[in-house]
């Protein structure tokens, strides 16, 4: 099975997250995409002190009608800081015969050298970097940490960077929805509409639970 992995704080999950996952699933012929909310993200503090349980429930509501999507609470169950390398190793242990595709944003990919054991990520799985409009696989190659750049070679026919482990780095283009979780939180706080920015079920949950009313 080809399994996509999309992690994040999902505070809250919105339509751009879902569109990224769907485009990756379609373009790279992924059998499933698993959404994994971070319990305690190591690189940025959670805004609004929203519980893991609330963020997990919003993700469940968001993906409920798509059989190609699934949700995992593994980072909440594991506890502690949510390091991607730990999650990827756990997934590889659970699904040793599956091909893993780790989906990350361009900003995250550009900062990947700051991640714990980032070198091992490319040995465990393929990486799909969601690029800004106009970016190319060449700019993706330039973002590789110098320490490991020599482990990759450019495959122009496939438009990917092949890693010596047999995995690859792909550039996903064309996801143009300019939606951010911070904008949604501020809109809720200011009493503005968030309709069409996220699934209806998630919007209703936010209103029912009075989430983000005082968050920034």
UniProtKB/Swiss-Prot annotation:
One of its GO terms (molecular function) is nicotinate-nucleotide adenylyltransferase activity. Its EC number is 2.7.7.18. Keywords: ATP-binding, NAD, Nucleotide-binding, Nucleotidyltransferase, Pyridine nucleotide biosynthesis, Transferase. It catalyses: nicotinate beta-D-ribonucleotide + ATP + H(+) = deamido-NAD(+) + diphosphate. Transmembrane segments: none annotated. It is an enzyme of class 2 (transferase). Pathway: Cofactor biosynthesis; NAD(+) biosynthesis; deamido-NAD(+) from nicotinate D-ribonucleotide: step 1/1. One of its GO terms (biological process) is NAD biosynthetic process. Gene3D superfamilies: HUPs. CDD domains: NMNAT. InterPro entries: Cyt_trans-like (IPR004821), NadD/NMNAT (IPR005248), Rossmann-like_a/b/a_fold (IPR014729). Catalyzes the reversible adenylation of nicotinate mononucleotide (NaMN) to nicotinic acid adenine dinucleotide (NaAD). Belongs to the NadD family. NCBIfam families: cyt_tran_rel, nicotinate (nicotinamide) nucleotide adenylyltransferase, PRK00071.1-3. PANTHER family: NICOTINATE-NUCLEOTIDE ADENYLYLTRANSFERASE-RELATED, PHOSPHOPANTETHEINE ADENYLYLTRANSFERASE. This is Probable nicotinate-nucleotide adenylyltransferase. It comes from Citrifermentans bemidjiense (strain ATCC BAA-1014 / DSM 16622 / JCM 12645 / Bem) (Geobacter bemidjiensis).
